[in-house]
Design a protein with these regions (language model features):
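Low-complexity, glycine/serine/proline-rich disordered segments
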Residues: 1-98, 170-174
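Long, charged/polar, surface-exposed segments that mediate recognition or autoinhibition
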Residues: 81-139
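Active-site or metal-binding loop neighborhoods of secreted/extracellular toxin and effector enzymes
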Residues: 134-175
Length: 175
């Protein structure tokens, strides 16, 4: 659910999201009325479930993804570095099960997942950059009635998801 109240209380509710880049660089200039789903940080860095339709949810942190893949019997097909050091696109398949619940192979569908290496980007660093990217394209996306848009911060392209009715940034992740 969206966070309500003043901008400072919105940002405080999700862990001082107003501070970008960590400290000395200052405070973000977020557009009027902009709010963030408080679960974004958890989604970026932790396992958020696995479905047959969507694959692994959350786990954009490489270590968390690898742990979720191992735990859930996922088959990693490839890891392709992007143009940004520390950002990688992983392609994977999820297990297929028989009626008894036994793994009998893998689903044909190949799922992509963009992950960040926590040795290069901290969870907070990715969160800060994602919020900066979200703020950058926010007004334009809202005026066009978009539910998702791409925006760049720190050289990283983020896919940003909006609730176009409330204006809340519901999610974002490196693309």
């Amino acid at each position: 659910s969206p966070v309500s109240g003043s901008m400072s209380s919105q940002l405080g509710a999700v862990g001082d999201l107003g501070r970008l880049g960590g400290g000395a660089k200052g405070t973000a200039n977020f557009p009027e009325g902009m709010s963030f789903n408080p679960n974004i940080k958890n989604h970026l860095s932790n396992f958020d479930g696995l479905t047959q339709k969507s694959g692994i949810s959350g786990t954009h942190n490489l270590d968390a993804f690898n742990q979720a893949a191992t735990t859930n019997g996922v088959k990693v097909l490839s890891e392709t570095p992007t143009s940004v050091a520390g950002i990688t696109t992983v392609r994977y398949q999820i297990p297929a099960y028989d009626r008894a619940g036994n793994i009998v192979g893998f689903k044909d569908k190949i799922f992509p997942k963009t992950v960040y290496d926590p040795k290069i980007f901290t969870d907070q660093g990715i969160l800060d950059l994602g919020q900066q990217a979200a703020a950058g394209g926010y007004k334009d996306a809202l005026s066009k009635g978009l539910s998702q848009y791409d925006s760049v911060a720190g050289g990283i392209t983020f896919r940003v998801y909006l609730d176009k009715f409330t204006g809340t940034v519901t999610n974002f992740h490196p693309k």
